[in-house]
From Swiss-Prot:
This is CD302 antigen. GO terms for biological process: phagocytosis. It comes from the Eukaryota. Residues 1-22 form the signal peptide. PANTHER family: MANNOSE, PHOSPHOLIPASE, LECTIN RECEPTOR RELATED. The keyword Manganese does not apply. It comes from Homo sapiens (Human). Potential multifunctional C-type lectin receptor that may play roles in endocytosis and phagocytosis as well as in cell adhesion and migration. Isoform 2 and isoform 3 are produced in HRS cells by a transcriptional control mechanism which cotranscribe an mRNA containing LY75 and CD302 prior to generating the intergenically spliced mRNA to produce LY75/CD302 fusion proteins. Keywords: Cell projection, Cytoplasm, Disulfide bond, Glycoprotein, Lectin, Membrane, Receptor, Signal, Transmembrane, Transmembrane helix.
Length: 232
């Protein structure tokens, strides 16, 4: 009975633990490192990259930016296995003519790139970047796209959750762990008490004092006393 009851006791607590460490806006987002990602699979017609970007900003995010090889690999793997995205994904990048460099829309630093070999002599005005899913490389292309088959968005874990949630998560984990331990101990104590009580009741019943005489003996004795034997 105790073993069968434990899963029912633990499942709600495990659900609370999962909720305590969830940092992304909803279950449709996927967390990796310090960011959350969502792939909007709806195909839309666009007039500029800003239309694509608006798809992300409407969800409180921005177009994808990539900052290391691990993140690039994560996006490729997730697009192939879970999101089922198109062959090329538009990156949240634009060419800044002021200093002749590519920059991310989310204003993060350009710390990593994976450009494929291309001729850089061409005019880069109105040039955007695409992630090629089959190779994982980035390639340059015209920003004047007429449609996109999906938009990949990214948002950072909120500051409050990222930097202040460690203590909250620790406290929540301790509370949950304590609750689990107390629940299990309570169930064990109850089980042992119930078992001991049943055993004690059985023992008391089986060892109750029994009369040395049965009813027949009592009757016989009574009869003997009622008619005493007379001696001459």
């Amino acid at each position: 009975m105790l073993r069968a009851a434990l899963p029912a006791l633990l499942l709600p607590l495990l659900g609370l633990a999962a909720a305590a460490v969830a940092d992304c806006p909803s279950s449709t987002w996927i967390q990796f490192q310090d960011s959350c990602y969502i792939f909007l699979q709806e195909a839309i017609k666009v007039e500029s990259i800003e239309d694509v970007r608006n798809q992300c900003t409407d969800h409180g995010a921005d177009m994808i930016s990539i900052h290391n090889e691990e993140e690039n690999a994560f996006i490729l793997d997730t697009l192939k296995k879970q999101w089922k995205g198109p062959d090329d994904i538009l990156l949240g990048m634009f060419y800044d003519t002021d200093d002749a460099s590519f920059k991310w829309f989310d204003n993060s630093n350009m710390t990593f790139d994976k450009w494929t070999d291309q001729d850089d002599d061409e005019d880069l005005v109105d040039t955007c970047a695409f992630l090629h899913i089959k190779t994982g490389e980035w390639k340059k292309g015209n920003c004047e796209v007429s449609s996109v088959e999906g938009t990949l968005c990214k948002t950072a874990i909120p500051y409050k959750r990222k930097y202040l949630s460690d203590n909250h998560i620790l406290i929540s984990a301790l509370v949950i762990a304590s609750t689990v331990i107390l629940t299990v101990l309570g169930a064990i104590i109850w089980f042992l008490y119930k078992k001991h009580s049943d055993s004690r009741f059985t023992t008391v019943f089986s060892t109750a004092p029994q009369s040395p005489y049965n009813e027949d003996c009592v009757l016989v004795v009574g009869e003997e006393n009622e008619y005493p034997v007379q001696f001459d």
